[in-house]
A protein has these predicted regions:
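Short histidine/acidic/glycine/proline-rich micro-motifs that form metal-
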Residues: 2-3, 69-71, 104
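Active-site flanking residues adjacent to catalytic metal/cofactor-binding acidic residues
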Residues: 66, 99-102
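Metal-dependent phosphoester/phosphodiester hydrolase catalytic core
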Residues: 42-44, 53-77, 81, 90
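Conserved hydrophobic/aromatic beta-strand scaffold that supports enzyme active sites
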Residues: 9-11, 47-51, 65, 148-149, ...
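Structured beta-strand-rich core segments of catalytic domains in phosphoester-bond hydrolases
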Residues: 1-60, 159-163
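N-terminal, active-site-proximal structural segment of metallo-dependent hydrolase catalytic domains
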Residues: 3-7, 81, 184
Length: 184
């Protein structure tokens, strides 16, 4: 809800490796600067971002994390357009990574605005997989891919992975984590 309850798009980073230069959250709605629900969305949805500097190389990049609505088709389509516009406005020409639960398969036309400016880590990494990302706590077919990582700028994507291990429990979420190894 933007105050004390609801969804959060946390970004975790290695504090001994990266300096946090700036960060923020916006809402996937017609009023992104304040807590709100967009279009035909069932829930308030957000995008969180962080500007990070690598302490080793001194290079900076942005990481954006989002979660598109699970019910509203218009909310997903408009959410992608807003995400693309906000990445351009916030990151400028600085390298950027976008990750999240898009609640949409890769071949959906809603990705067109995104794929004009960013590349799919799953498709571009020399080491990759074709594992499904949504498991529904064991109730979904294991071929559904609705979680994605995209990148742009002077980043080299080295590896993409869907982390399907059980970590001591069969399912830690209804989605499997995904990961991208990259160099700046």
């Amino acid at each position: 809800d933007g105050d004390k309850a609801g969804e959060t798009m946390a970004i975790y980073y290695l504090r001994d490796r990266f300096d946090l230069l700036d960060s923020g959250t916006l809402w996937l709605s017609e009023t992104p600067d304040r807590p709100s629900r967009g279009w035909d969305g069932a829930c308030n949805r957000t995008m969180t971002w962080a500007e990070l500097r690598d302490r080793t190389s001194g290079k900076t990049f942005f990481y954006f994390n989002t979660h598109l609505d699970h019910k509203g088709k218009t909310a997903r389509a408009e959410g992608v357009k807003l995400v693309v516009a906000q990445i351009a406005a916030i990151a400028g020409k600085t390298p950027a990574i976008l990750g999240g639960d898009f609640n949409t398969p890769t071949d959906s036309p809603i990705f067109r605005p995104l794929t004009k400016t960013m590349k799919s880590a799953r498709d571009k990494a020399p080491e990759t997989d074709r594992e499904g990302t949504f498991n529904g706590f064991g109730s979904a077919p294991d071929t559904i891919v609705i979680d994605h990582l995209y990148f742009r700028g002077k980043l080299k994507c080295l590896r993409f992975a869907t982390l399907t291990g059980d970590y001591g429990a069969p399912y830690i979420s209804d989605h499997y984590p995904i990961s991208m190894t990259f160099s700046l």
